[in-house]
Amino acid sequence: MSILIENISKTFGTFRALDHVNLEVKAGSLVALVGPSGSGKSTLLRMIAGLERADEGKIWLAGRDATYAPIQKRHIGFVFQNYALFKHLNVAKNISFGLEVRQANPNQIRSRVRDLLQLIQLEHMADRYPAQLSGGQRQRVALARALAVEPKVLLLDEPFGALDARVRRELRSWLRDLHQEMPVTTVFVTHDQQEAMEVAHEIVVFNQGRLEQVGSPQEIYDHPATPFVMGFMGHINHGVDDVQQSSYFVRPNDVIIQLVPSTNSLSGKVVGMTYGDTSMKLDVDIPQQVPSSDWAPRGSLWRIHLSRRDFNQFNSMLVGGIQIGSVLYVQPRRTEMVRGYSI
């Protein structure tokens, strides 16, 4: 089911939560809403669900005006961060709850629960209670319960926010695979930019109640529309173009390191090193002044991402290896000018 948000605004007292927002979500897509706290993303999600009323504007579901439609008429499944499972019901009964309320055929209920347990890979835990499950397992049950009634739209509000980092990574992959098997139109709110980049087909970036940019993960990361998006969606390094008297940004993976200076290279000293399974992160202090702005602090610290292979190659070429205090020369492979900003 498609979703069309048309000129939606919402105010709480004197706080403008949403300011004339327009957004189209295509049927079957997987969309992430990201932005700082208070930017309006959760408010919009609740409006789509029918939990909040707009001050102005319209919400269209599958081409029909649903602005004032009651929750039960919207055919929407909603999953919150805190699971909201019934503690006194086992896994199977939690999943079947919505179907039983609708007085579905008992055979259909059993079949649907069986299919969903298989889908979330918890067939062996059908008789367990929520207290006997891990956080990740409880969240999968919550998703299955939302899917049991075959919603046209699935809304997820910080679905993995209460889980530890390892479980979140596992569930990101699981959610992506789940959506491929059951391509229900899905909109989820997250504070984790990396989660949005890994899971979503399309990302919507909010800031102060307005949309800053809508696009694919690649578009958002490589071609940010505004300085805010640039700084919010991943780490950025800043440089100054003395010829054009403007500022530019470089992503950490678009920096080349060298052992000797070359044209347009910048010298710097390694002040931090972070080891990863497949990559290395270097923090290099470059003696240049970058003007401060509302989207980035003043500073000269560049972060550089290298594959372990490239790092090992450079490490073998430098006497004593790359270590804290080593002097390197860096050069941007690709830069983006900061639109609307100059020094």
Curated annotation (Swiss-Prot):
GO terms under cellular component: ATP-binding cassette (ABC) transporter complex; chloroplast
Entry keyword annotation includes Nucleotidyltransferase: no
Domain ABC transporter intervals: 3-233
EC number: 7.3.2.3
SMART domains: AAA
GO molecular function: ABC-type sulfate transporter activity; ABC-type thiosulfate transporter activity; ATP binding; ATP hydrolysis activity
CDD domains recorded: ABC_CysA_sulfate_importer (cd03296)
UniProt subcellular location: Plastid, Chloroplast
Family: Belongs to the ABC transporter superfamily. Sulfate/tungstate importer (TC 3.A.1.6) family.
PANTHER family tied to this protein: SPERMIDINE/PUTRESCINE IMPORT ATP-BINDING PROTEIN POTA, SPERMIDINE_PUTRESCINE IMPORT ATP-BINDING PROTEIN POTA
Record protein name field: Sulfate/thiosulfate import ATP-binding protein CysA
Gene: cysA
